[in-house]
Amino acid sequence: MEQSHQNLQSQFFIEHILQILPHRYPMLLIDRVVELEANRKIVAYKNITFNEDVFNGHFPNKPIFPGVLIVEGMAQTGGFLAFTSLWGFDPEIAKTKIVYFMTIDKVKFRIPVTPGDRLEYHLEVLKHKGMIWQVGGTAQVDGKVVAEAELKAMIAERE
């Protein structure tokens, strides 16, 4: 049953994120949610460190965090917003659901992300109907937009 969780807490730490999202190392790309308004918007971040495995090959002498992983982090953030908007913080329901990426539109990469950056994801709900959610927003470092995108996802039963 779809419902709205307007009184949801606004901050979530890694132990909370791990209970809602199925992603794990090295593909969990959110460290903390710092702002969440159900059905409206979310702000989360990932600290980028030189210890990321991806820097072994992207690129050894000039480490740049891959754009596709920035978009994946935005998608995970949007998925967290969609799930918690529908069911609140409910780890038991999270075990039965999965968010599938459907489309990526209007992606632009503006500034490289490098070790030491705090990559913030700022997303807002563009529209949703049932289990289909469309979100859009930016990835930022120090208040500067490094990437932007619109994403569509579907929440389904995990089998």
Swiss-Prot record:
Domain of life per record: Bacteria
Record GO terms (molecular function): (3R)-hydroxyacyl-[acyl-carrier-protein] dehydratase activity
The keyword Lyase is assigned to this record: yes
Alphabetical list of InterPro entries matching this protein: FabA_FabZ (IPR013114), FabZ (IPR010084), HotDog_dom_sf (IPR029069)
Signal listed as a keyword: no
Gene3D superfamilies associated with the record: Hotdog Thioesterase (3.10.129.10)
Major localisation: cytoplasm
SUPFAM superfamilies: Thioesterase/thiol ester dehydrase-isomerase
E.C. number(s) listed in UniProt: 4.2.1.59
Sorted UniProt keywords: Cytoplasm, Lipid A biosynthesis, Lipid biosynthesis, Lipid metabolism, Lyase
Biological process annotations from GO: fatty acid biosynthetic process; lipid A biosynthetic process
Role summary: Involved in unsaturated fatty acids biosynthesis. Catalyzes the dehydration of short chain beta-hydroxyacyl-ACPs and long chain saturated and unsaturated beta-hydroxyacyl-ACPs.
NCBIfam families the record matches: fabZ, PRK00006.1
Protein's recorded name: 3-hydroxyacyl-[acyl-carrier-protein] dehydratase FabZ
Source organism of this protein record: Helicobacter pylori (strain G27)
